[in-house]
Amino acid sequence: MREYNIGISVIIPNYNGLELFPQTIPTIFEALAETKLENEIIIVDDCSTDDSVKYISENFPSIITIKNIKNSGFSKSVNIGVSHSSYQFVLILNSDVKLTKTFFTNQISHLSNPKVFGVMSKIIGWDNDKQQDGATYPILELFKIKTSTSYSYKHDDNQARFTTYLSGANMFIKKDIFYEIGEFDEIFSPYYSEDTELSIRAWRLGYLCIYEPKAICRHKISYTMKKSQKKKNVDIIYNRNKFILHELALTGISKLFWRLQLFIELIFRIITLNFRFIKSYILYIKMFGEINRSIHRFNTNSKKLKQNKSFTDVKNFKFNY
């Protein structure tokens, strides 16, 4: 496995995030300064129309800016950013997130464990301390993957814990493992479920995902999405990507029964004229070629690493780290 220089690269995929930059970017510099490590900030601009790039170049000239030729979505933008990064520790960060001063210093010790893929912090409100996200555990409910069930809300004792997934809003990972397990799958472009799938893939290939509540960031929920997308389009892509997630994460009898219940649900949605769900299903079916290529890539990596846990194995992890 290739070795990279020790330091921190912050990757920010951006679409029209200019309005929040004056509030977010200074907090990143402050948190990086606390680490005493070499660092860089890379913004991958996804064809913004709000002068984001101009603002960054004029006000933060040390930030590296990469401009996508066409709007490509979250997973591709992050992959581009990581490919241009210089350091082993990579923070994937939404443009609508503010960091606290000790954000990195409370997480970085976990990355010394060779089996840890990455860490995520506690996510609280932009203007309040209400928790938005934390450690989650996976559930198969009628063969549907549920990853939003949080046990950190009930056990918020400031203890680091295992978590099913690392949120794409603040995913602090190791670059060598990111490449070893295969980067973000761009099949999920433009958005949704790519962080969940990557995290489950890491678990299945023998790595660990950690939640560290002592590290905190503030998030303005779906700020960019609300500005750029219609709810109808968001719903269609959300459902399509949930279907793809199940195809990639499930195996054997679990996948067979999931497909059966999905077909039954499709019949009900047709009867009730739920056209958004139907459109999502059609898009999912059209992507079977890409889905199979993704499965093939996973199987190739699985053979190299000699690891191939099922989703059932993943959901049996112990909560305490």
Please place each PLM-identified region on the residue numbering.
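Short aromatic/hydrophobic "clamp" motif used to bind/position activated sugar donors
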Residues: 90
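Glycine-rich, basic loop-to-helix element that forms the pyrophosphate-binding segment
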Residues: 68-85, 95
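Short, well-formed alpha-helical segments that are part of the catalytic scaffolds
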Residues: 17-32
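Conserved donor NDP-sugar-binding/catalytic core segment of glycosyltransferases
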Residues: 98-138
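Short, flexible, basic/aromatic active-site loop/helix in glycosyltransferases
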Residues: 140-163
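A conserved acidic beta->alpha catalytic loop
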Residues: 27, 45-54, 70
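A short, conserved alpha-helix in the catalytic core of glycosyltransferases
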Residues: 164-182, 187-216
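Non-catalytic, C-terminal membrane-associated alpha-helical segments of glycosyltransferases
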Residues: 233, 237, 252-321
